[in-house]
Curated annotation (Swiss-Prot):
One of the primary rRNA binding proteins, it binds directly to 16S rRNA central domain where it helps coordinate assembly of the platform of the 30S subunit. The keyword Ribonucleoprotein applies. SUPFAM superfamilies: Ribosomal protein S8. Part of the 30S ribosomal subunit. Contacts proteins S5 and S12. The lineage of its organism: Bacteria, Bacillati, Bacillota, Clostridia, Eubacteriales. Belongs to the universal ribosomal protein uS8 family. One of its GO terms (molecular function) is rRNA binding. Keywords: Ribonucleoprotein, Ribosomal protein, RNA-binding, rRNA-binding. This is Small ribosomal subunit protein uS8. HAMAP family: Ribosomal_uS8_B. GO terms for biological process: translation. The gene is rpsH. GO terms for cellular component: ribonucleoprotein complex; ribosome. It comes from Clostridium beijerinckii (strain ATCC 51743 / NCIMB 8052). Gene3D superfamilies: 3.30.1370.30, 3.30.1490.10.
């Protein structure tokens, strides 16, 4: 079966694994998914990323991060721009998530980046997701 929205699949797998407090989650790999995972790593939402090939398709293994007493680091994750309804923002309309407590992942002409970087570089683009 063909996957219509692989980014939503990544976010849903992370959300579901986080909800039941799994240590790792495995997702099929792609360049966009790697960039989103690297952003989650840089922002402190996941511990590490491992890439491996199971023979059929390359996979990403994401180690989820939890606080003391298994408190979730990711409280919410939401897909914004979808294949059926793309959401774009201008350079002066880049969204803030929870007044700066969360991040918005934005796809710009200079690559995929966090809302802070897009604002700093004066770039707009497609709003991929919110993470808080």
């Amino acid at each position: 079966m063909v996957m219509t929205d692989p980014i939503a699949d990544l976010l849903t797998r992370v959300r579901n694994a986080n909800a039941v407090r799994h240590e790792v989650v495995e997702v099929p790999s792609s360049n966009v998914k790697k960039e989103i995972a690297n952003i989650l790593l840089q922002e402190g939402y996941i511990k590490e990323i491992n890439e491996y090939n199971d023979g059929v398709v390359p996979m990403l293994r994401l180690s989820l991060k939890y606080g003391a007493n298994k408190e979730r680091v990711i409280t919410g994750i939401k897909r914004i721009s979808k294949p059926g309804l793309r959401v774009y923002c201008k350079k002066d309309e880049v969204p803030k998530v929870l007044n700066g407590l969360g991040i918005a992942v934005v796809s710009t002409s200079n690559g995929i980046m966090v809302d802070r970087e897009a604002r700093k570089n004066g770039l707009g683009g497609e709003v991929i997701c919110y993470v808080w």
